[in-house]
Curated annotation (Swiss-Prot):
The lineage of its organism: Bacteria, Pseudomonadati, Pseudomonadota, Gammaproteobacteria, Vibrionales. This is Ribosomal large subunit pseudouridine synthase D. The keyword 4Fe-4S does not apply. Transmembrane segments: none annotated. Residues 18-91 form the S4 RNA-binding domain. SUPFAM superfamilies: Alpha-L RNA-binding motif (SSF55174), Pseudouridine synthase (SSF55120). Keywords: Cytoplasm, Isomerase, RNA-binding, rRNA processing. It catalyses: uridine(1911/1915/1917) in 23S rRNA = pseudouridine(1911/1915/1917) in 23S rRNA. InterPro entries: PsdUridine_synth_cat_dom_sf (IPR020103), PsdUridine_synth_RluA-like_CS (IPR006224), PsdUridine_synth_RluC/D (IPR006225), PsdUridine_synth_RsuA/RluA (IPR006145), RluA_PseudoU_synthase (IPR050188), S4_RNA-bd (IPR002942), S4_RNA-bd_sf (IPR036986). The keyword Isomerase applies. It is found in: Cytoplasm. The active site is at 139. One of its GO terms (cellular component) is cytoplasm.
Amino acid sequence: MAHQIELTQTVKDSQLGQRLDQAVAELFTDFSRSRLKEWLLEGKIAVNGDVITKPRTKVMGGEVITVQAELEDEQRWEAQDLPLNIVYEDDDIIVINKPRDFVVHPGAGQADKTVLNALLFHYSPIAEVPRAGIVHRLDKDTTGLMVVAKTVPAQTRLVRALQKRDVTREYEAIVIGTMTAGGMIDKPIGRHSTKRTLMSVSPMGKHAVTHYRVAEHFREHTRLRLRLETGRTHQIRVHMAYLQHPLLGDTAYGGRARIPKGATEELTEMIRDFDRQALHAVMLKFEHPVTGEELEFHAPVPDDMVEMTLALREDAKLNRTEEY
């Protein structure tokens, strides 16, 4: 289903000489530039009553711009009563702590029982917001914090904040191998040339930057704290694999079990049985899209990663050798 919207604004004198698409973006700030340009090209925007479809048309100031368009509801997806771990909620946003084995958006691999289905059940008006308010995603087996918009204006502003890199997203991870220092990875990411469900570092890919620092050393693993500067699909997983330090448990990107020499049977079994990428979105900080208040949220590291960290720490302690 869809619902009709009709909006009117008058071009400001200060916008004299601007392109129409630029003027429209400044006047109708509740919607993204890409959405407004799409409406413009589809003939859904009129200037003084005349439909204009050329983005480069210049405005003079004083023109009345009218938008008549449809907003698609997300009602093509079923509302499902699924548990949501809600960290924070108000009239404009929801912050959730996503567990493992929970897909964010329906797709070819999974048509329902996703975060989106749960959101539609929890707050039915969110069906009027594109993608049910989802502005960024976590992989199925990545745990941690996500922010969701409950209104179109909130969604537009959050998307812009992400694009401007005004949203801080930090992750906790366990990677394979010993890393001696932190750093930054600035490598473009694109679709894998042969494995189409995976991504890879590619000169033809999109700009991608990940910052990381070492939080703790183990014998054959390292605990990291990472910060996303961009938000590409599988970004941390791809970048760490590129450094030849894939995430523990991430078999898709080379994270095969590596057992420390002389490890106990219990630790050996834990490492072999760890069946997801050891990655958790631990901190999320951003300005509230309506009030402007700075918000910061933290999600405790899940039990499976805590238990693995404790086991690796104990192994390192037991096998520490003195240097002379």
